[in-house]
Structures are given as structure tokens and as C-alpha cells.
A protein has these predicted regions:
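Short, Lys/Arg-enriched N-terminal segment that forms or immediately precedes the first helix
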Residues: 22-38
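Short, cationic-aromatic polyanion-contact patches
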Residues: 34-44, 59, 92-111
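Short helix-capping/hinge SLiMs at alpha-helix to coil transitions
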Residues: 39, 52-55
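Pre-recognition alpha-helix immediately N-terminal to the DNA-recognition helix
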Residues: 46-50
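A short acidic, leucine-rich amphipathic alpha-helix
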Residues: 62-68, 81
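A short, conserved structural fragment
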Residues: 83-92
């Protein structure tokens, strides 16, 4: 899973990197560009991702309570992570439950 080649000329590098990761036991890996990775690697967002890796909260509110942050702040972080395809929502009819969209998230090679 990568970004559009017309927008990002490093798409081939990310695609090849994802293929190598798959061959070495890391299927379903999202490979982010360096620029996009900067949007993910904030302490609070990493805390949210760590929690989602271990738990399946029933709602954004439940996640916010679990990580000890304001629901609005967590909701905005989740929206940003969803735009990057890092997080998705499962709608169970009562609430949107945030989940990791991929088993792994990596960053393209820096050099």
C-alpha cells in the first residue's frame, strides 16, 4: 500500500520495500513516505497505535479514556491516521470502533 506514483516519484522504492518485507514474513505492511511518517510519529499518536495493537476499543470514546486523552484530540488524531491508511473504523451499528488498518507500518528507506 503506497501513495500515487504521479504525486511521489519514490513510489517504486516503497513498492519494492513492501515486497521484500512480505517475502521476509511481514505481509500487510503499509510503507509510508518519509514525509507521511512525520505525521504518524508523534508521541500521542504512537500511544494510540500502541493501544490499538494490543486492544480493540469499542469506540473512540473508549480509546480516549484508555489512553487518558480528550476524546476530541484522539478523534482528530484518528482522522489523521485514517487519512494515511494507518487506522480504519469498524462500524458495529452503535459506534465506530478504531482499528489498525495493517499488521505493520514501515517507513521507506531514508537513503
Amino acid at each position: 500500500h503506497t501513495e500515487d506514483a504521479d504525486v511521489d516519484p519514490r513510489l517504486a522504492v516503497r513498492t519494492a520495500f513492501a515486497e521484500v518485507l512480505t517475502q521476509h514474513g511481514f505481509p500487510d505492511t503499509l510503507v509510508l513516505s518519509r514525509e507521511r511518517a512525520g505525521e504518524v510519529f508523534h508521541e500521542r499518536r504512537l500511544e494510540i497505535l500502541d493501544h490499538l495493537a494490543e486492544h480493540d476499543p469499542e469506540s473512540v470514546r473508549a480509546l480516549a479514556k484508555a489512553v487518558g486523552h480528550d476524546k476530541g484530540v484522539v478523534s482528530r488524531d484518528l482522522q489523521a491516521l485514517a487519512r494515511l491508511d494507518v487506522v480504519e473504523y469498524v462500524d458495529d451499528g452503535r459506534a465506530k470502533a478504531p482499528r489498525l488498518a495493517h499488521d505493520h507500518v514501515a517507513v521507506e528507506p531514508v537513503v
